[in-house]
Amino acid sequence: MADTEQGYDPKVQVKETGPQVHTLELLSTDAELKGSSFQRGIAVLGRVFGIVSGVEARGIERVADDERQAPAPNTYTRIFLLWLSSALTGNNIIVGLYGPSLYGLDWSQATICATLGVILGISILTWFIATLGVHLFQFYTRYAWIIQILTLAIMIGSAGPSFITSPFLSPDIPRATVSDRLSFFSLCFASAITWAPASADYFVYFPTATKSWRMFLAGSTGMSLAMALTTILGIGLATGIDSNQAWIEASLASPGSLLAASFSNLHGFGRFCAVILLLGTVSNNIPCTYSAGLNLQMLGRYGPRIPRPLLTTLEVVIYTVCAIVAREYLREIMENFLPLMSYWIVAWLALCLEEAWIFRRGRDYDWAIWNNPNRLPMGLAAGASFVFGILGAVLGMSQSYFVGPIANALPQKCDLGMWLAFGFTAVVYPAFRCAELRVVGR
C-alpha cells in the first residue's frame, strides 16, 4: 500500500476549518501559501465549497485520532449493513446470469462455483478492511438494504417458479466441463475481489480501537450474504430463459431487460419493482465513485490540491456519458472487462499480502510518514513484480479478444489469467523486495 503513496509532497498538510470539513493547503516553511494562481484558486474553491455545503471535502490525508468517531455499540452493525447494501444490487445478479448462459452450468454447479468464489473473494477483501481500515453514505446503507431485500424477495416470488434446479438444463446444451466451472468461479471471484483496493476507504473515521477480527466478521458476512444471494438469483433467471419465451426476447435485448421481465407477472407493480431494483444500484455506485476520487488524488503530488468533491463530479459526468453510449453493450463489457480488472487487482493483492506478512510480519504501518516520499519504499520491487504478474495474466487469459499461449495449450480453453497473475507476482516479489531493501534501505 505504501508503494502507491509515493510521490506526495511532504509539505502538503491538513488545515482544520471545522469539525468535519477539511481542505488542503500547500504550506511553505514560513507558512505562506505558494503555488500558481490556478492552484490557489482551487484551494480557495475547496474551502468555500466545504464551508457552504457541509460536504466532506477531505481527500487522501490521514484522519487524526481526535477527529475520529467515538466508539459506539452499533459500529460493527454499520460495517455489516454497509457491505450488505453495497452488494445487494441488480448488477451482481447479472454476474450470475453467465453461469448457465455462457458456461453451460446447471443450477447446482453454477451455485456452488458462485458461492465459493464470492466467499473467497469477500474474505480476502475484508482482510484489507480489518487491516487498513462517509457519513452520508453510511447513514444511507443502514436503511437501503431493507428496500433492496424486499424487492429481491418479490423477484423470487415472481420469477422463482420458472427457475430450473434440475441437474441438467437441456439435452441441447453441452455438459459443463472443469474449465467452464473454473472460468465461472473466477468470474464470481473477480466480482468480489475488485472491492479490495478501495475497501478501507469507508471506515477512516472509525476509532483506532475498532477490533480487526470483528470488522472481518461484519464485512465478510454482509458482503457474502448479499453477493451470494444476488448471484444465485442471476443463475436462477438464466436457467429459466429457455422455458420462457418472454425471457428469451428480454435476454436478447439486454441483461437489464431480463431483470425487468422477471417481474412481468406482477404487471404495474412489477414495473415499479423493476425501477426500485434499478435505483438500488446507487448503493453500489456510491462507494465506487467515492473511492475513485481518492484514487485520482493519488496520481501525483498535485492531486491532493484538487478538492475531492470536484473530482467526484467530474467522474460522474464521464461515467454517465460512457454508460449512455455503451448501454447496448453491457453484456460484452461485463464479460470482458470484469476479468481484466481482476488481473491487476490480484497482482496488487499478492504484493500487499507478502509485504504485510513476510516483510512487516503483521506489524502496523507507520502512518505518520504517509506523505513523505523520502521515507516510503521507492516501489521498484513492487513495480517490477507487477510487470511479471501482468505477464502471467497475458499468458493465461482466455477472452474473446485474446487467448494466451498457456490457455490455448490446454485441452479445453480456460481463463487462468487471474491465477497466473497472482502466482507470478507472489513468486518474484520476495526476491525483488529483499534486493530493494539491501540496495535502497527502505
Language-model-detected regions and their locations in the chain:
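Hydrophobic, membrane-embedded alpha-helices of multi-pass small-molecule transporters
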Residues: 76-93, 156-162, 173-240, 264-289, ...
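Hydrophobic, small-residue-rich membrane helices and short re-entrant helix-turn-helix hairpins
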Residues: 70-76, 132-145, 177, 194-229, ...
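Loop-to-transmembrane helix boundary motifs in multi-pass membrane proteins
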Residues: 121, 298-332, 373-393
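Membrane-interface "cap" regions at the ends of multi-pass membrane proteins
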Residues: 2-98, 105-107, 179-186, 204-216, ...
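C-terminal membrane-solvent junction of multi-pass transporters and transport-like membrane proteins
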Residues: 348-428
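Hydrophobic alpha-helical segments and their helix-loop junctions in multi-pass secondary transporters
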Residues: 126, 130, 147-173, 188-193, ...
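Membrane-interface loop-to-helix entry segments
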Residues: 120-159, 217-219, 338-345
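Transmembrane alpha-helical segments of multi-pass small-molecule transport proteins
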Residues: 111-131, 146-156, 191-199, 304-325
